[in-house]
């Protein structure tokens, strides 16, 4: 699986839709397979995020004895990942995310970086290069 440009715990800005302009922390990132080929391999996959306090939906839930009361609860709904932008922790602006590979000695590190301020956001992966 490819590295994610938006991860759990990131602060994002909603850039499209009814909730446009709202900010929040990413609670969950997941994907849904929309279509599969004849062998059962995913062909069309959509990525979604759940953002804290954004796209609140009402759910009608039945009571479960000893666990919860029944009634109407409010919870966050999914937003397509293309409708949110990461807010850079360094410059505090909404930005696109890129990946940068840095080789230091025999270690190869992959970073996410802000395309506005060109600063590293966080380390994605680290590999030790054999021989060479």
From Swiss-Prot:
PROSITE patterns named among the record's database cross-references: RIBOSOMAL_L24
Keyword flag tRNA-binding: no
Record key words, sorted: Ribonucleoprotein, Ribosomal protein, RNA-binding, rRNA-binding
Name of protein: Large ribosomal subunit protein uL24
PANTHER family cross-referenced by the UniProt entry: MITOCHONDRIAL RIBOSOMAL PROTEIN L24 (PTHR12903)
Lineage of producing organism: Bacteria, Pseudomonadati, Aquificota, Aquificia, Aquificales
GO molecular function, one term: structural constituent of ribosome
Family according to the record: Belongs to the universal ribosomal protein uL24 family.
Gene Ontology cellular component terms for the protein in this record: cytosolic large ribosomal subunit
UniProt entry tagged with the keyword rRNA-binding: yes
Pfam families: KOW (PF00467), ribosomal_L24 (PF17136)
Organism the protein comes from: Aquifex aeolicus (strain VF5)
Annotated function: One of two assembly initiator proteins, it binds directly to the 5'-end of the 23S rRNA, where it nucleates assembly of the 50S subunit. One of the proteins that surrounds the polypeptide exit tunnel on the outside of the subunit.
InterPro entries: KOW, Rib_uL2_dom2, Ribosomal_uL24, Ribosomal_uL24_CS, Ribosomal_uL24_KOW, Translation_prot_SH3-like_sf
HAMAP family xref list: Ribosomal_uL24_B
Quaternary structure and partners: Part of the 50S ribosomal subunit.
SMART domains hit by this protein: KOW
Any one GO biological process: translation
């Amino acid at each position: 699986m490819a590295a994610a440009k938006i991860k759990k715990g990131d602060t994002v800005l909603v850039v499209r839709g009814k909730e446009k302009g709202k900010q929040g922390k990413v609670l969950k990132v997941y994907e849904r397979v929309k279509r599969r080929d004849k062998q059962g391999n995913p062909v069309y996959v959509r990525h979604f995020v759940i953002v804290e306090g954004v796209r609140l939906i009402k759910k009608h839930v039945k009571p479960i004895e000893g666990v919860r009361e029944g009634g109407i609860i409010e919870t966050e709904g999914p937003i397509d990942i293309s409708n949110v932008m990461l807010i850079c922790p360094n410059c505090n602006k909404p930005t696109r995310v890129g990946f940068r590979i840095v080789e230091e000695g025999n270690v190869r590190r992959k970073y996410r970086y802000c395309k506005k301020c060109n600063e590293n956001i966080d380390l994605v992966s680290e590999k030790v290069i054999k021989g060479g």
